[in-house]
Design a protein with these regions (language model features):
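Intracellular juxtamembrane helix-capping segments at the cytosolic ends
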Residues: 114-128, 306-319
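Helix-to-loop junctions at the C-terminal end of transmembrane segments
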Residues: 61-73, 157, 253-265, 349
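Helix-loop-helix hairpin linking two adjacent transmembrane segments in secondary transporters
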Residues: 100, 137-185
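Conserved MFS/SLC helix-loop-helix module at the cytosolic interface between two early adjacent transmembrane helices
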Residues: 60-95, 99
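Structural signature of the two symmetry-related core transmembrane helices
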Residues: 76-90, 268-283
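Short amphipathic helix-loop junctions that connect adjacent transmembrane helices
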Residues: 31-45, 222-238
Length: 379
């Protein structure tokens, strides 16, 4: 029993390291984007297509990861994805042509999709063995990694280090985290019958909710600063503060999320999270007032923070599909939301206004309190 407890604690730490490393590497890419664009001489339109390669690589890899994890367990896929990110971060900086950058980004995205699905499958298994909520804490480490990665790479570049040098430092740090995690990950045997990961049963509802939550997160990332400028609340140079407050609030909420889930239950977290996010969206649309808008972005982060971790936990407990396949299905559908959502917001904003398009997100978030009872009734 003592050995089992030690093994479980080690697996918890390894899972946190995997989330930290993945969030760190992904955030390291953000400050390197302008340098990669300049290196290949791509204009905005071409570079937009190149960034789409990253997303498509992730989308393709996710269901395949669920399939393979069902056969062999998540450990091998976590290591494949994690070390793939470590290897390809420097390569996306030095890719000499548009075509090689597109290929490198597709592989980088595939590695991201692989570790994203696999570490959530592993996290669900650890949570099940621990018999207590842990998913929000794991996702908090992704958020912490994101803050460290973006801040660290920005500091290195500002200090005069070359883009390749900064990328190599980021890869080395993430690689160390993966090396520490590797021997402590659960050695699951898999054994579930592999099958196509089309969501079905309650997993379909969870997947739709994940797509909505990811869509809102993507909208805040891609359109939040533009909304602040469009509303005449702040100049473009400072408009990124909205997303910063969103990210900080989300990280804080996830660090306390496991305690909240244990105290309130997953259904109440979905209800409260949806309502808080709806209130936040409404505040961002108050005309001519900056502080309500900034408070609104923070509330969106607080509300959305624990929704996706709860959905992943519920997917892993569903009897409609094997846990690994269910998590893969929810993750893949969620990423479709974050990829397609911002584009849909753009189309809606063009047809109406950005404020109206943002307001429509509140209507979508109403799905969480409305569906909470059904979605959280697993069994």
């Amino acid at each position: 029993m003592i050995s089992d407890d030690k093994g479980l604690r080690a697996a918890m730490h390894a899972t946190r390291l995997a989330f930290l490393a993945a969030g760190f590497v992904m955030a390291c890419w953000a400050p390197l984007i302008p340098f990669a664009k300049q290196h290949v001489g791509a204009d905005e339109g071409v570079f937009g297509l190149l960034l789409l390669c990253l997303g498509l690589g992730a989308i393709v890899a996710m269901p395949l990861t669920g399939y393979l994890s069902a056969r062999t367990g998540a450990r091998a896929m976590i290591l494949l994805g994690g070390f793939g990110l470590v290897a390809f971060l420097p390569l996306v900086v030095i890719a000499p042509t548009v075509w090689t950058l597109g290929l490198a980004l597709a592989v980088f995205g595939a590695a991201l999709g692989t570790i994203d699905v696999a570490m959530n499958i592993h996290a669900a298994e650890v949570e099940t063995r621990a018999a207590r909520p842990m998913m929000s804490g794991f996702h908090a480490m992704w958020s912490v990694g994101g803050i460290l990665g973006a801040g660290g790479l920005t500091a290195l570049l500002s200090a005069g280090l070359s883009p390749l040098g900064a990328a190599l430092v980021g890869s080395a740090l993430a690689g160390c985290a993966m090396i520490l995690a590797a021997p402590r990950l659960l050695r699951q045997s898999g054994g579930a019958k592999p099958e196509f990961v089309r969501p079905r049963g309650i997993v379909l509802l969870l997947a739709i909710l994940a797509a909505i939550s990811f869509l809102v997160e993507g909208a805040v990332l891609d359109w939040g600063a533009l909304l602040i400028v469009d509303q005449g609340l702040m100049a473009a140079t400072g408009a990124g503060i909205g997303y910063m407050l969103f990210s900080i609030a989300m990280t804080i909420a996830r660090l306390t999320g496991d305690w909240l889930v244990a105290a309130l239950g997953r259904g109440r977290i979905m209800i409260l999270g949806g309502l808080v996010a709806m209130a936040g969206i409404a505040l961002t649309l108050v005309p001519g007032m900056l502080w309500p808008a900034l408070l609104g972005f923070a509330l969106i982060g607080l509300g959305c923070a624990n929704l996706v971790p709860v959905l992943f936990s519920l997917a892993a407990q569903s009897r409609d599909m094997p846990p690994g396949l269910a998590v893969a299905a929810v993750t893949t559908t969620g990423y479709a939301g974050i990829l397609l959502g911002p584009a849909l917001i753009g189309f809606a904003a063009d047809a109406t206004s950005l404020a109206m398009a943002f307001g429509a997100l509140a209507l979508l978030m109403a799905a969480f309190p409305l569906a909470a009872q059904r979605a959280s009734r697993i069994g």
